[in-house]
């Protein structure tokens, strides 16, 4: 029985999961994903829209009061980041020039020493995008999995690293504020906003089989966690939706409760990435060009989000999965030659 259940909850789409996929990210209007071969007969009913999650790192400066129309402004974002970095340095290192890379690492080591549950340790990981000329781009992944990137034009690799560290430090500091915790009041406010957005009724919020009910279940299950922690969990479900895996699980008769319970406690790992990459290999074989189109779209989204100072893990995981799929296709072609 458990073996059958585990098989139904696998992230892969399989041959029965092909169809039109929509990259509907929770709370964000997404662009259409790659279109695979449409099934014969009438198209299946689309999945119910996912209700919006709590406000997460919008405009790159969570909780920071910005003037009207300033959200997304590079100048305002840069000013906000510098202000937070200076404030953090003042309280931890005294006045003077800040080594923001060291400050970010020190912040997470301090969290760990105070009892934060960091399953993979407190190490902050940097990744430079290969390039022989500016602008240079750097990504930084925090211990919990959240990802940020250099948000400025960076003429050197060192500057790109500092830029990524600055935006990551700002979000790390803001994430400690009490207003960034999921509380009963926050849950009620978020669910009410979701009901208003989708013209739902209160009964839907209490039924875990509805989209809004599932959203409430997710919030309730993560009460006390921070926005970054919640976003890390939501990334798994965003990827499952983008890849068509949630639709495939419904076709395999998996209930919402089963899916939520299973993936709420499963970290995003190489097995999930590999299975999703295989799905994109299959799509590319059915519809040549689907993979390259989706990769180009994903790279544009990643760059736009990076320059806006937003959390990037969903976009970056998408890109990594698609690059993995392209590599698998290349290996298959080489072996056939």
UniProtKB/Swiss-Prot annotation:
Query: Which ranges are annotated Pro residues under compositional bias?
Result: 39-56
Biological process (GO) annotations held by this record are:
autophagosome maturation
Where along the sequence do coiled-coil regions lie?
Answer: none
Q: Which Gene Ontology terms of cellular component type are present?
A: cytoplasm
* Positions of region (Disordered): 1-64
Q: Where is the composition biased (Low complexity)?
A: 26-38
- InterPro entries membership: Autophagy-related_EPG5 (IPR051436), LIX1 (IPR029270)
Report the sequence similarity comment from the record: Belongs to the LIX1 family.
| Entry protein name | LIX1-like protein
UniProt organism field? Homo sapiens (Human)
